[in-house]
Amino acid sequence: MKTLLIVLIKGYRNFISPLFPPSCRFQPTCSKYALEAVERFGVLHGGSLAIKRILRCHPFHPGGYDPVPLVDSSSKRSQ
């Protein structure tokens, strides 16, 4: 499943994205973020991070630098 999602994201980046002018408000782009998130955290958590990021990518959000987290913050216990 992870491989399929990665292939779909790469397909979007290579074939669909070039047809439109750049419009992502973030660095790295949302598709690059999604690819890194799925590679690092897998389909469920990485996909969830990607969806949340895509939902923030709109004209009313300032955007900016927003990298994929280095560690899975959902697994940290509050002390």
Curated annotation (Swiss-Prot):
Keywords from the named record: Cell inner membrane, Cell membrane, Membrane
Subcellular localization, as worded in the UniProt entry: Cell inner membrane
GO CC terms in record: plasma membrane
Topology of this chain in the membrane: Peripheral membrane protein
Record has Ribonucleoprotein as a keyword: no
Disulfide bonds: none
One Pfam family per UniProt: YidD
Keyword Membrane (UniProt): yes
Alphabetical list of PANTHER family matching this protein: MEMBRANE PROTEIN INSERTION EFFICIENCY FACTOR-RELATED
HAMAP family: UPF0161_YidD
Annotated family: Belongs to the UPF0161 family.
Function text: Could be involved in insertion of integral membrane proteins into the membrane.
Name of the molecule in the record: Putative membrane protein insertion efficiency factor
Organism classification: Bacteria, Bacillati, Cyanobacteriota, Cyanophyceae, Oscillatoriophycideae
